[in-house]
Amino acid sequence: MANDKIIWTFWEPRGKIPEYIKLCMETWKFFFPSYKVILLDYSNLNDFLPKGTYDKSLYENFSLPKQADAIRAAILYLHGGIWLDTDTVITSSKIKFFFENQSNFSIFSGHIGALSAKKGSVICFNWLKECQKRILEYKKVKSNNGDLSQFEVYYYLGNGPLNSNIEKYKNNKDEICIFDRIENRVIMEGFWKIKEDNKEGDSILNYKNFYFLSDHSDFVLENERGMLMLHNSWTPCNYKDLSIEDFLICKNTLSGIFLKILNLDFNKMYMDIRDRLYLRSLQANPLSFQA
């Protein structure tokens, strides 16, 4: 299935994708309808990864984010295409420069949440091989009751094995194209802090404040270059539990972005939710509307 017009992503279990994440993925289809989106999970992974690509201990010993790191290395090597983490927002078709880049591997400043690769990319091949090695090494140490602390870093199967490859090929334009993530504003809260001449503050707190506790959607849409990379692990849990409608009436940066770029009708949604809540109140208090 070598096809550049595929967007790959991974979420396990599929049935527990937060509603706001579904909105993120909807933006991909909105701006790039000609691309096929393939959502990987345990139910279909073997359809795309040959048996034995990774030792089965990958799925037993490692967290889902680490599994996703190894999976993307293999998927892009075997099939090519675009990899987007599910919490990626496409804000306009401007990002086609990344989708259509002709290098064998493209990345934003070492941020592996969005990748573009040609089938057979040497960088993806080396990444895949190093993941295979690291998975078996972890398994061996664990089986011998050894010290696993050295393996617990979040980048063990992601930037850990990838960065040395990036360094090796960084001057080979055929093999790799590295886009600056601040210049291209994919980490918009970082760009906003620079514009505000305020580089202080905790990254997680800045993320929460920028996207969920205030509304900078106009700033984002005035300055966007086509893509935003969110951090689902940093997203406040109460927002992950909201329905799409309830999320969209939050009046924050992210809800504002979705409403504007997907051309959604806020007033209609507000009225629908208000009516639904009113009906719930009547059901809870049946005597309140009896004559």
Question: For each of these PLM feature ranges, what is it?
Answer:
Residues M1-A68, L84-A291:
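Glycosyltransferase-associated regions of secretory-pathway enzymes
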